[in-house]
Amino acid sequence: GPLYFIYKIISVLKLCKTLEKEYPDNNFVPTFWLASEDHGEGEISKINIFGKSFEWEHSEKGASGKRGAVPYSKIDSELRELFKEDDQAQEILNIFTESYSGAKDLTHATRSYLYKLFGEYGLVVIDGDDIKLKGEFASIMKEELLNSSTKQKVSETIARYGQNYKIQANVREINLFYLGNNFRERIVKE
């Protein structure tokens, strides 16, 4: 959920530091892929802290990053009460409030929050829904759409290594989605 991605980022930052020591002639850039095109409501709309669940509701569908700002004010006072004796937690809540209160959508809010928390450590946040990034990726998307290239490569990899590893996700014939205002639909070959 929303707290786990912070743990993942800290792990990447630590890994980069370890690799820089082990390979001093190389530079390692901590990178976080912001899954702004995903739909993972269950992953992003609820946190559990000390057995208490905090959840934000929304009616929007489609890509999670395009959703309007998080209605955090509903849970802000509860979180502040929970951490009232912890100055560091209050500081993090202040950064969260500053990042999410004026943002136009979830992508901008989350990017702001991450840069405020981890920017000084060199974290780079990549937004999968960025139009320029998609432009660079256009030939790969075309290949996927016409030739199901991901399915072919993943099937080869599973055939080679599958018996030694648990498969985490099943590949589909076309691994692309059509995104529009308030919807996200899988592209299916007919």
Please identify what each model-predicted range represents:
Residues 1-190:
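N-terminal targeting/trafficking signals and adjacent low-complexity tails
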